[in-house]
Amino acid sequence: MERPHRRSAAEIVKGEQSVLTISEADVERLLDPQSLIDGLAEGFRALGRGEIQTPDRPEIAVPGKGFMLSMPAWQAGGPMMVKMVCVFEGNLDLDLPNHLALITLFDADTGMPVCVMDGTYITAIRTAAAAVLSVRELARRDAKVATIVGAGVQGRQHLHLLPLVRDFDEIQIYSLYPEDAENLAATAPNARAVRDVEAAVRRSDVVCLCSHAYQPVIEADWVRPGTHVSSVGYTPWPGELPQDLIRRNTLFVEDEAAFRPQPVGCAELDGLDLSIAITLGDVLNGTAPGRTSSGQITVYKAMGIAMEDLVAATLAYRRAVDQGEQASARF
């Protein structure tokens, strides 16, 4: 029987490929926050079992302007993903977001691109959703008062997601810019702006640090026994989270890579040994303890990992496909 002719590599061209494009507005429409939190929990479990590839993220720095990171990830059974994220703090003066991102999904069988989507909203909501997942897993069940330090993008996302995991009586919002705190507090019925961050932290059961501060925004002695503290700020040393708070209490991280030098790891963990930390995946898999007493202070320090982007982007893409959305670009 004659074998069919197989073209040589030199004869094969990619040709036009239909690619779904998803705008920032459509990503926001497609992503359900509760599904994202639950999806991230599964993602952390898989990461803890070694089932997700997340190579270290390389950085391109533009002196005096900002930097760009490349964040790839893949889990068997799903698409490959890469997010390109730019952090340019000066954009705020130009009325532009200081975090901008673009995500591309690739078919894991062929390597062909299948979707290009905005990653700016995904970066914002997945960061907050992972931190709020830490609240779900590590905060006391009877937590009633939360404080958010920072009234920017992360402060807003935290305010909207925290009620999904605890029934808070009150959420306090502090910002160096009181008007921003007032405006954000007005968007939620049980939120209020505060001017005294120390007093707010001292009466809190949950404290969420959501700033761009290059220095600690709270002091370790303000945090009362039984509190859960989360920190999502990503800045150079020493960062928003005081290191003595980390040293004195129980630390939880997304991944052991958090202890590597930036841009991979967290500035606040510089000089600390990774043996002091427990990964969120190990807690969720039951291979390490979470909260062990009502008086324990738990601390979650986020670095932001590509697994979170993979989970969020895959959720948005699959929902778009399920809703019959058609490819809108050809390459």
Model-identified regions with their sequence ranges:
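Glycine-rich Rossmann-fold phosphate-binding loop(s) that bind the pyrophosphate
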Residues: 151-152
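Rossmann-fold NAD(P) dinucleotide-binding segment
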Residues: 213-228, 241
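N-terminal ligand-binding/catalytic initiation module
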Residues: 2-3, 8-124, 132, 142, ...
